[in-house]
Amino acid sequence: MFKNLFKSSLMILFLMIGLSGKSFAQELKFFTIGTGGTAYTYYPVGGMIANAISKPPGSRECGKGGSCGVPNLIASAVSSRGSVDNVNAIISGLRNSGFAQSDVAYWAYTGTGTMEGKEPAKDLRTIAALFQEHIHLVALKKSNINSVKDLKGKRVSLDEPGSGTYVDAKLILESNGLSTSDVKAEALKGKAATDALRNGKVDAIFVVAGYPTGAIVELASAVDIKLVPIDGAGAKALTSKYGFFSESPIPSGTYEGVDQVNTVAV
């Protein structure tokens, strides 16, 4: 039953022993939310949640133009390298809470997958499941990359090793008979990744985010792009092996000039 909780969604997590946050003068409380890179979805969503739950001393009353948050709480969204970084920061006590992909949360809780060899984080708890995150494999429209297998020998940004995107990119390559050694892997994030693609420094980039995500919206408005399908036997193998992946399309028109594409979500 618990495993079913980790199906295809972004989660906000905390450690059961650390929910209260840091206090000052026994009244003012601080609560941090680990998010992701500022160019992607996590950071603005984290900022909205932080604003909604904050209610500093002296705030106007709820319903009278003031905050309806937790009295004397100041919450803040903190940029990070993403899901893996957030989970590790929560476990270590560096942050009070954070966003994590469902697969990363499951692996942390069970001490398996990318967290194999680490103590299972049994005190890790889910506050809410927020939304599905779709794997975007982005290339320039003029490129000859039309499937995951076409990435062989190409320059591909997998994102930073501390991110959930990096983990998922490796799994997608593996489910299509490739490994990181089959591509010229780069560890670029956010605007650095989209700029590298636009300027021809890389051939494709992986992005895991709710759609539409700002970095790709901006890229599509500047240059013709395509979303490369993640489907067929590779997607079936991935979703069969890992229950937290599901096949889910990104609709036509989500990004300028880009038709509907079949991909997977987590």
List the model feature ranges, each with a label:
Residues 1-10:
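Bacterial N-terminal signal peptides that target proteins for export
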Residues 9-18:
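Bacterial N-terminal signal peptides
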Residues 19-25:
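Sec/Tat signal peptide C-region and signal peptidase I cleavage site
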Residues 28-30, 70-72, 82-85, 92-95, ...:
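Extracytoplasmic
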Residues 30-65, 132-199:
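Bilobed "Venus flytrap"/periplasmic-binding protein-like clamshell domains
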Residues 63-118, 191-196, 211-220, 238-239:
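Pocket-flanking alpha-helical
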Residues 102, 113, 179-266:
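Pocket-lining segment of extracytoplasmic ligand-binding domains
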Residues 117-130, 254-263:
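A structural signal for short loop-to-beta-strand junctions that line the ligand-binding cleft
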